[in-house]
Amino acid sequence: MRNQDRPEHQTRGVLPTRLAAAGIAALMLSLAARASAEALGPPEKEDLKLGFIKLTDMAPLAIAYEKGFFEDEDLFVTLEAQANWKVLLDRVIDGQLDGAHMLAGQPLAATIGFGTEAPIVTPLSMDLNGNAITVSNAVWEQMKPHVPKMADGRPEHPIKADALKPVVESFKAAGKPFKMGMVFPVSTHNYELRYWLAAGGLNPGYYAPHKNDTDGQIDADVLLSVTPPPQMPATMESGTIDGYCVGEPWNQQAVFMGIGVPVITDHEIWPYNPEKVFGMTAAFVEANPNTAVRIVKAMLRAAKWLDENDNANRAEAVKILSRPNYVGADEAVIAASMTGTFEYEKGDSRDVPDFNVFFRHNASYPYYSDAVWYLTQMRRWGQIAEPKSDDWYMETAKQVYRPDLYRLAAESLIADGLMEASDFPDFDTETGFKPTQTGFIDGIDYDGTRPNAYLEQFSIGLKGDKQL
């Protein structure tokens, strides 16, 4: 899948005419941005192969391709769907792919050596939110008596795992394991599912890589296992799993098939949580710094396009994503979450305008605090087997997350007249750490500058000097 002809875009290198009247401060900022942009040379590598998994949050790649944003940067890109997250990561590491749509935990895990070890970096967050937890119809019927109701009789959201706990206990009493699927051991889905379960008093199990135990089921009340995203509905329908956590469109697919009910979105577990990132090897970035920045430029334009004017472009995006070479699901299924609504029980569609966020709320910025959160969850569930200092968390985050590349891309776009300084964080004051984050389903606040103190707040999970 590759464009053959370069589109005739005429906007590159043109500063908005209103800049002349903008005032001293704005002028100085623009001049600095222009200097940065002029320092950005031609791409070291023009022909690129980028990977993705068939999920709606690969959208920035599809839009950057379809709208000619890659070619505006003299990049000629082939987008290639991958079978699963492991294959995708391995192909980036061995150079078959130049970069890819990745789980936020993948660059971190690869860098610290959980799983395949290789230095991977990310200069861009691809989206916020976008996942949900779905259970089978049979499980939902057993959960419903434990779910509070609104005045109109519909379930009150968010639905906590407290309502699932009696169901899990009934399975245990009958001698049956309760099984749920997630997409990869270092996926947001794994950590969100574990977070939700633990908040409801259910232990999702521990990993012990130092004992060669990478199943993550030690002491588990609920057995979690890996299933590729497109296979989730069929795997649940067959009875192999009783529920799952996945990105779209595979929760809405269960509703359309009439086989399951999404009970909670990840926005209800952790509002505006970081989801996917764009990952490349550190070696690729070192050898091709201009190429890396130009990739980020194209994807930033795509991310803004997806969110601008209150999601006005989402209907067009849905049509693009429904093509078989991208997500390949029915338009109606993709639109169910991409256009500002989300269907829980069949017929119970509710407004969820921020189910997918690609650009607003600084969604694309690679915050160190996001990286630290993922690392805390790796420690909490044993993927990081031994205690780590706060400094270790900070140093690892800064090794993997590359806001310096993001800034170069943003300043170049500003100089090109394609975006405004107001589209981005204030780079002169941005620390990379968000203010203390609230709204988690368990009521625990997160301060990314104090990872060990954060871990101490959990009743279920490893913390302090505890090891398996």
Feature roles, as predicted:
Residues 287-404:
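Secondary-structure end/capping motifs
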Residues 133-134, 277-280, 284-285:
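Short glycine- and hydrophobic/aromatic-rich loop-to-beta-strand nucleating segment
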Residues 33-37:
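Sec/Tat signal peptide C-region and signal peptidase I cleavage site
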Residues 372-468:
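Conserved C-terminal helix/tail region of periplasmic/extracytoplasmic solute-binding proteins
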Residues 9-21:
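N-terminal export leaders
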